[in-house]
């Protein structure tokens, strides 16, 4: 069994950069369905946001990697989040 880093508990952080508000959320999940449900919950909570940029890495070998740029230029939002998670070996 491979040892991997994961999120201990649900958390959030907020930062304001040049009048733009960025809010990050993380939550431990084991399946894509759990991740999708969490993403929908956040989208509903922030339905007035210009962009909601979800990303997920799931599996002990990081088998599932997915992200959306949600209207931002392709590869500029979701993909960097996945790269950060995988480089830190964070999954689930």
Regions found by a protein language model. Give the residues of each.
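Active-site beta-strand/loop microenvironment that shapes enzyme catalytic pockets
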Residues: 83-92
């Amino acid at each position: 069994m491979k040892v991997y880093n994961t999120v201990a508990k649900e958390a959030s952080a907020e930062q304001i950069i040049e009048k733009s508000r960025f809010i990050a959320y993380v939550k431990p999940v084991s399946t894509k369905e759990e991740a999708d449900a969490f993403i929908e919950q956040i989208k509903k909570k922030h339905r007035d946001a210009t962009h909601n940029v979800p990303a997920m890495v799931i599996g002990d070998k990081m088998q599932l990697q997915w992200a959306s740029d949600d209207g931002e230029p392709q590869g500029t939002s979701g993909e960097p989040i996945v790269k950060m998670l995988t480089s830190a070996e964070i999954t689930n």
